[in-house]
Amino acid sequence: MQKYISEARLLLALAIPVILAQIAQTAMGFVDTVMAGGYSATDMAAVAIGTSIWLPAILFGHGLLLALTPVIAQLNGSGRRERIAHQVRQGFWLAGFVSVLIMLVLWNAGYIIRSMENIDPALADKAVGYLRALLWGAPGYLFFQVARNQCEGLAKTKPGMVMGFIGLLVNIPVNYIFIYGHFGMPELSGVGCGVATAAVYWAMFLAMVSYIKRARSMRDIRNEKGTAKPDPAVMKRLIQLGLPIALALFFEVTLFAVVALLVSPLGIVDVAGHQIALNFSSLMFVLPMSLAAAVTIRVGYRLGQGSTLDAQTAARTGLMVGVCMATLTAIFTVSLREQIALLYNDNPEVVTLAAHLMLLAAVYQISDSIQVIGSGILRGYKDTRSIFYITFTAYWVLGLPSGYILALTDLVVEPMGPAGFWIGFIIGLTSAAIMMMLRMRFLQRLPSAIILQRASR
């Protein structure tokens, strides 16, 4: 029991800064929306539309680079720290290549925006302008993620938290300057949010690099001079590990976007209630997602040390802590769901629907916690392909079709509206949790030599 308590302390010490960093990042998006809304409702809508396209694109790159964390954790645990610098440099090359692709997609996103049904031309122009300003921040964001993944792979999660809050604090005045045109800058309205956020991402990257260069704990990693050339073998391995994670993230984000589109014809009350419940459950999701990042670090580190038993301990402890957290957040959600809904909207119909949907959200919080931590465990074992297959099957083969049938058809019961989609979420997330646990159990039953060989690739 003592080993599990000790492991839980280590996991929480790693996870809490990640939680706070994620809150800071979420708050940046909130600040952009609110400050654009302070200028005009059109600018607020433009930022919201632009963000809905930016997120899937940038999260694809973010997911691709998540492969660095278990690679660095495993090298750190095995005492091969001299190889970390080369992996990080290849991570920067990969981030640069992916940034170019993302920037091309975002530059041409105007075709998607202008094809939206009944969209106001002025709104479309502002959304395109916002994206074309924000896309210049894509390299800065992804370079920052490489540097952050380096730190987190070395079990240093506090720098990412600090840089996240620095970015948030800088974002507010820089937004103000570019939205309203102060200190000699042009008045860009909502487009100014894109300029400001792009600048902040570069500032966060430069601040993180400055920290890494000065950190004594990373002195031995900075032993390579000059800029390493692209190493096709290393980059290929990073892509093999990262692409399934990137696709899984992409399919998860697009799932919720598709459901939002399917709910939209049902009426204002249904859309508002669905959005409130989804926004709150997304906030609760930060906890298990951050714990999953910590579990990846611990599992990768233990496998690097050559201890499959300690890796199992880290995995099991992460699951136990995650289930405890999810139980508490589920109780909190059930107990205060009406009061929470009132914070968003005071329309009685909207509040009633949102409270009902939050009850369904509470049901899946334990499953959601297990599946996301299970994904973190599999990343630690470098078993990322299974994450993609499980996520795709659970969300798009099981969850979305069942939700559609329950919400919009009478094949099983009378159309349930938004609640049907939320039952679909429960089916999808529970299926993902079961499959993640089965895969983890399969991996952990393999001979230690095979597990360690797979982890060292």
From Swiss-Prot:
Pull the Periplasmic topological domain ranges from the record: 32-52, 114-126, 181-191, 264-275, 335-349, 408-417
The way it spans or sits in the membrane comes to: Multi-pass membrane protein
Q: Which residues lie on this side of the membrane: Cytoplasmic?
A: 1-10, 74-92, 148-159, 213-242, 297-313, 371-386, 439-457
Q: Which residues form a coiled coil?
A: none
A GO BP annotation: xenobiotic transmembrane transport
The entry's localization annotation reads:
Cell inner membrane
Cysteine pairs bridged by disulfides in the record? none
**Gene Ontology CC annotation, any one:** plasma membrane
Q: What is its main location?
A: membrane
What Gene Ontology molecular-function terms does this entry list?
Answer: antiporter activity; xenobiotic transmembrane transporter activity
Transmembrane regions: 11-31, 53-73, 93-113, 127-147, 160-180, 192-212, 243-263, 276-296, 314-334, 350-370, 387-407, 418-438
Keywords on record = Antiport, Cell inner membrane, Cell membrane, Ion transport, Membrane, Sodium, Sodium transport, Transmembrane, Transmembrane helix, Transport
A UniProt-annotated Pfam family: MatE
Q: Which family does it belong to?
A: Belongs to the multi antimicrobial extrusion (MATE) (TC 2.A.66.1) family. MdtK subfamily.
What is the recorded function of this protein according to its Swiss-Prot or TrEMBL entry?
Answer: Multidrug efflux pump that functions probably as a Na(+)/drug antiporter.
Name the record gives this protein: Multidrug resistance protein MdtK
Q: What is the lineage of its organism?
A: Bacteria, Pseudomonadati, Pseudomonadota, Gammaproteobacteria, Enterobacterales
